[in-house]
UniProtKB/Swiss-Prot annotation:
The keyword Cell membrane does not apply. One of its GO terms (cellular component) is cytosol. The keyword Metal-binding applies. It comes from Shewanella putrefaciens (strain CN-32 / ATCC BAA-453). Substrate binds at H14, D16, G170, D279. GO terms for molecular function: 2'-deoxyadenosine deaminase activity; adenosine deaminase activity; zinc ion binding. InterPro entries: A/AMP_deam_AS, A_deaminase, A_deaminase_dom, Ado/ade_deaminase, Metal_Hydrolase. Gene3D superfamilies: Metal-dependent hydrolases. GO terms for biological process: adenosine catabolic process; hypoxanthine salvage; inosine biosynthetic process; nucleotide metabolic process; purine ribonucleoside monophosphate biosynthetic process. The gene is add. Catalyzes the hydrolytic deamination of adenosine and 2-deoxyadenosine. It comes from the Bacteria. It holds the Pfam family A_deaminase. This is Adenosine deaminase.
């Protein structure tokens, strides 16, 4: 099912959406933060999706607990370190960890640039202990508005040498991409690649805007592209990568079932598409789970899964030499 001769990658993986349950428990008690449960065992349902629960509101509440316990920069560093460990332990050869420093900082009024530094330090420490390649993607959380995104952008650009790309995430309908054109001009001027959450809550026009105005070469989720034949043709022709996260799409009610997920439609249209975990801590999944789901629920063959695996390597924000090194390590 997973081809061991091809690097296994996860390109759409939120660092701040992957905080271990025991870490939430320990940090909560360490910092005197009131938690919604009185034991580690009973905490899990408040911070992780249970069974077939599918609700965007419930999902976001669980996600909020992941950052509620980030009371100081040491906590941020710990979570970043554990993200590297989790990536390695799940069998990944390469992961791009994306994070929103404003979202991580807001509960306890941490310095945004300090959060970025703590993430970088935690990842560096993790890479000393675990054999996995990691790159970082900064996120601007559009839901907090343009001014907050400017603060976030400045904190991230102060450490641009530690980033490969920038992302736009959050409320796609309330805060359309047009509001952030100037922000992304600064991103392009800084020489960073661009991905954007688009076509998830909004229609295909949001994806066109992300590609044509923000400069995105990859799109997160993008499920609504299938309703726009011209866009599908454009995506395939220009190798715009779709970072697909089927289980997360189900958990957030972006799709009503795996059977309704458009992954197969993208594949058949020749669009470059990869499998990813999104918020693995909230969804309680790993990348192997997504490949199992792709086979059993999305009905992909082993040959198609291998193609998806290769797509991920092609889509990665890596140089050609880095890509070759990933493949060489699999021989």
């Amino acid at each position: 099912m997973i081809d061991t001769s091809i690097p296994l990658v996860d390109l759409h993986r939120h660092l701040d959406g992957n905080v271990r349950v025991n870490t939430i428990w320990e940090l909560g008690h360490q910092h005197g933060i009131a938690l919604p449960a009185d034991s580690l065992e009973t905490l899990a349902p408040f911070v992780q999706i249970q069974g077939k629960e599918t609700s965007l509101v419930a999902f976001l509440k669980k996600l909020d607990w992941m950052v509620a316990v980030l009371a100081d920069l040491d906590a941020v560093k710990r979570v970043a370190y554990e993200n590297v460990a989790d990536a390695a332990l799940s069998g990944l050869d390469y992961a791009e960890l994306r994070f929103s420093p404003y979202y991580m900082a807001m509960n306890h009024k941490l310095p945004i640039e300090g959060v970025v530094e703590a993430v970088v330090d935690g990842v560096k420490a993790g890479l000393k202990d675990y054999n996995v390649k990691i790159n970082l993607i900064g996120i601007m959380s559009r839901s907090f508005g343009q001014a907050a995104c400017t603060q976030e952008l400045e904190g991230l650009l102060a450490h641009k040498q530690h980033l490969v790309a920038m992302d736009l995430a959050g409320d796609e309908l309330g805060f359309p991409g047009e509001l952030f054109n100037d922000h992304f001009k600064r991103v392009r001027d800084a020489g960073l690649a661009i991905t954007a959450h688009a076509g998830e809550a909004a229609g295909s026009q949001s994806m066109w805007q992300a590609i044509q105005e923000l400069g995105a070469t990859r799109i997160g989720h993008g499920v609504n592209a299938i309703h726009d034949p011209k866009l599908m043709e454009y995506l395939a022709k220009h190798r715009i990568g779709i970072e697909s996260c089927p289980t997360s799409n189900l958990h957030t009610s972006t799709v009503v079932s795996y059977a309704e997920h458009p992954f197969r439609t993208f594949m058949d249209a020749g669009v470059l598409i990869s499998l990813n975990t999104d918020d693995p801590g909230v969804s309680a999944i790993d990348i192997k789970h997504e490949y199992r789901i792709a086979k059993s629920e999305l009905k992909l063959t082993d040959a198609e899964l291998a193609r998806v695996q290769r797509n991920g390597v092609e889509m990665a924000f890596l140089s050609d030499s880095e890509r070759k090194a990933l493949y060489a390590a699999k021989i």
